[in-house]
């Protein structure tokens, strides 16, 4: 009951200021390391900006907790149809906070909750778009790859340099690179720590589109607006179906897709979409 009441308070505070959501309180105080606002013509896209400029948005525990809390609230906000995560022009996120991790030991790292809230991005049911400028390295690269779609600036740089400091990626880098770009390229990235240009990342299926640096966020928001204009329920089903391609065999995936396709025929939005198409009008979605 306490958790439910807390969520209500957080939702109310998050939505209090539509144009500039300086989120009031995810815990006991306003977030310090992220900025949030609702953007777009219909204010239906949430823009989260990582805000540790002096540290090139290094992903410390506090930042990741604030991000996880924000995503939890936004995922239940019916006025938000898509979420964009971005950093600065110099860095989306230059990696995890190495100083914070230096003195960690195996026992506490393995048995504790270290990195546990990093799954928040991939757990979100709504589409999440990464708008990447500058460096997206280590944990920053992994954060971008947790998102559903990546738009990148022309000078963006991706990579997993953990090998250079005596460790390996720990938030999905080895797995997501291999699934997206294949074993050979993933091995090169993870075993050398080499940076990957935006164009190389696009060629290997990591990045969807590339834009001039000053257009990346705007284009990501436009994409978010287009997605937010669709049925939220059907968007969620489509996202789930695509993600299953990484977990299931082809036959299992085809079966899963078919079942979800059949399930759309139990929704009001499928009926409305097809009726609106036949009547040559814009559908009015209910997310039911």
From Swiss-Prot:
Homohexamer. It is found in: Mitochondrion matrix. This is Probable enoyl-CoA hydratase, mitochondrial. Pathway: Lipid metabolism; fatty acid beta-oxidation. Its EC number is 4.2.1.17. Keywords: Fatty acid metabolism, Lipid metabolism, Lyase, Mitochondrion. It comes from Caenorhabditis elegans. Its main location: mitochondrion. It is an enzyme of class 4 (lyase). It catalyses: a (3S)-3-hydroxyacyl-CoA = a (2E)-enoyl-CoA + H2O; a 4-saturated-(3S)-3-hydroxyacyl-CoA = a (3E)-enoyl-CoA + H2O. GO terms for biological process: fatty acid beta-oxidation. It comes from the Eukaryota. The record marks 162 as: Important for catalytic activity. The keyword Lipid metabolism applies. Substrate binds at residues 96-99, 139. Belongs to the enoyl-CoA hydratase/isomerase family. GO terms for molecular function: enoyl-CoA hydratase activity. The keyword DNA repair does not apply. The gene is ech-6. GO terms for cellular component: mitochondrial matrix; mitochondrion.
């Amino acid at each position: 009951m306490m958790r439910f009441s807390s969520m209500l308070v957080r939702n109310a505070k998050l939505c209090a200021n539509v144009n500039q959501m300086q989120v009031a309180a995810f815990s006991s105080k306003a977030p310090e390391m992220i900025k949030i606002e609702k953007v777009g013509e219909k204010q239906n896209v949430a823009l989260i900006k990582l805000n540790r400029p002096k540290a090139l948005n290094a992903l410390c525990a506090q930042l990741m907790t604030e991000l996880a809390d924000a995503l939890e609230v936004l995922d239940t906000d019916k006025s938000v149809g898509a979420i964009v995560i971005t950093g600065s022009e110099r860095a989306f996120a230059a990696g995890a906070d190495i100083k914070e991790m230096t003195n960690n030991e195996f026992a506490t790292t393995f048995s504790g909750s270290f990195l546990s809230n990093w799954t928040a991005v991939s757990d979100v049911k709504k589409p999440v778009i990464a708008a990447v400028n500058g460096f997206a390295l280590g944990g920053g690269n992994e954060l971008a790859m947790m998102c559903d779609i990546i738009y990148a600036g022309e000078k963006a740089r991706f990579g997993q340099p953990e090998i250079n400091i005596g460790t390996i990626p720990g938030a999905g880098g080895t797995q997501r690179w291999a699934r997206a770009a294949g074993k050979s390229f993933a091995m090169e990235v993870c075993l050398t720590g080499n940076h990957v240009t935006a164009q190389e990342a696009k060629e290997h299926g990591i990045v969807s589109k590339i834009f001039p640096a000053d257009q990346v966020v705007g284009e990501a928001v436009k994409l978010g607006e287009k997605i937010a204009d669709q049925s939220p329920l059907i968007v969620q089903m489509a996202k789930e179906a695509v993600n299953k391609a990484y977990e299931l065999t082809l036959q299992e995936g085809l079966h899963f897709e078919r079942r979800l396709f059949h399930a759309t025929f139990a929704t009001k939005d499928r009926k409305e979409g097809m009726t609106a198409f036949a009547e040559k009008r814009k559908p009015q979605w209910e997310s039911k």
